[in-house]
């Protein structure tokens, strides 16, 4: 119970901090237009939590890797936060500090980066993770991750890159998908993951995260 209260308190504090910072970051935009300076200011703001090269950050709250991500996926998720289809109090505030015409340019800026994976996963059943990624688990009605995310796990268009994604973020996100992701099928396709992750055990989730987090 104490851990839950601490997490709630820290989330609230972080949300307050980022709300204030978002207001300051808006000063980088000129008349709401996606100027080069405005986009760069937003990028620098993203690195506050996601790391200097958007490589992600391991901490009490794992921040996902945005570097090298599919630009259309980034655009879709920012709009999902704006429309409250994706639930996260911190990112909801952050997204509201980005003007709509900035979203494509910011997504392209993040997509162009390619830092090495953060690494540091605890060590687990990599072979199982590779099997799930490449072939799925037919007996559990879990399709191969590679079928959508590609053999290199770099995704395509609205399908996200998961190669090099932080182990801790992957485990956390896959574990709570039904409550924080995929609220409806419009206008992105995040909802299709719900039946897939529901059929994975915790051990399988950890093995999968272990495998993909090391991919380049």
Task: Annotate each predicted stretch with a short phrase.
Residues 52, 83-84, 113-116, 135-136, ...:
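Generic structural signal for alpha-helix termini and adjacent loop/cap motifs
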Residues 36-39, 53-86, 92-97, 146, ...:
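Gly/Gly-Pro-rich "capping" loops immediately C-terminal to redox-active cysteine motifs
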Residues 44-52, 106, 142-152, 208:
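The canonical Cys-X-X-Cys-His
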Residues 11-21:
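Bacterial N-terminal signal peptides
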Residues 38-41, 45, 73, 90-93, ...:
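Extracytoplasmic/secreted proteins, especially bacterial periplasmic and envelope-associated proteins
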Residues 2-13:
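Bacterial N-terminal signal peptides that target proteins for export
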Residues 96-119, 168-171, 195-216:
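C-terminal capping alpha-helices of c-type cytochrome domains
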Residues 25-43, 55-62, 112-139, 160:
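Electrostatic cytochrome c docking/interface patches
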């Amino acid at each position: 119970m104490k851990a839950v209260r601490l997490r709630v308190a820290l989330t609230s504090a972080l949300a307050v901090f980022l709300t204030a910072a978002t207001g300051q970051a808006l000063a980088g935009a000129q008349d709401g237009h996606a100027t080069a300076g405005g986009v760069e200011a937003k990028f620098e703001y993203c690195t506050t939590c996601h790391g200097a090269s958007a490589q992600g950050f391991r901490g009490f709250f794992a921040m996902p890797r945005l570097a090298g991500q599919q630009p259309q996926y980034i655009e879709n998720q920012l709009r999902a936060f704006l429309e409250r289809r994706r639930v996260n109090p911190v990112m909801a505030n952050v997204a509201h500090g980005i003007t709509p015409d900035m979203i494509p340019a910011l997504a392209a800026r993040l997509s162009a980066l390619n830092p090495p994976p953060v690494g540091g996963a605890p060590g687990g059943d990599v072979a199982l993770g590779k099997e799930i990624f490449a072939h799925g688990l037919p007996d559990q009605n879990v399709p191969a991750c590679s079928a959508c995310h590609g053999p290199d796990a770099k995704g395509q268009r609205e399908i996200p890159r998961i190669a090099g994604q932080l182990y801790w973020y992957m485990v956390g996100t896959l574990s709570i998908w039904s409550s924080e992701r995929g609220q409806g099928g419009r206008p992105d396709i995040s909802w299709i993951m719900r039946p897939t992750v529901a059929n994975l055990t915790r051990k399988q989730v950890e093995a999968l995260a272990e495998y993909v987090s090391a991919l380049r």
